[in-house]
């Protein structure tokens, strides 16, 4: 799923001083949404392009317009989407993740499962596939986040791992019924770009 969903980080009755942060959160959410769409579409191609193409840029711009963006916000979000996808296409790990050659590969894979307590849960896995070389199943969650001002890479990865380890653990439990293969879970940060594996208990 796309980043930036914590609307609860914005007060219920924000004052004027909160508005820039609210706009920033909205742009980050929309960038994440369109990056997810772009990576899904690329993963369905028989072969990955070496570069972002003009048709792709126009399609992503239209997706952002449909989300309600225009003017400077549209230009800023469009540039962020294009840069994230460029970085993924230029990254060997990104190209490996997006390759259509993996068996049992799915993007934006929708599942419905029951928790141990019987609660029904819907989930969408950004990318999953079997790695033929290792025989392992990968579950990968895309993130467009980057370290904050003054935040080290180690601090950033620790924070993101803590935030999403429960979500990835749920994905792993749901996917375990598909076969006996070992399952590895990771976050892929498109803006860095970096594949960061999570060690889940």
Q: Where in the sequence are the language-model features?
A:
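Substrate-binding beta-hairpin/strand module that engages nucleic acids
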Residues: 179-201
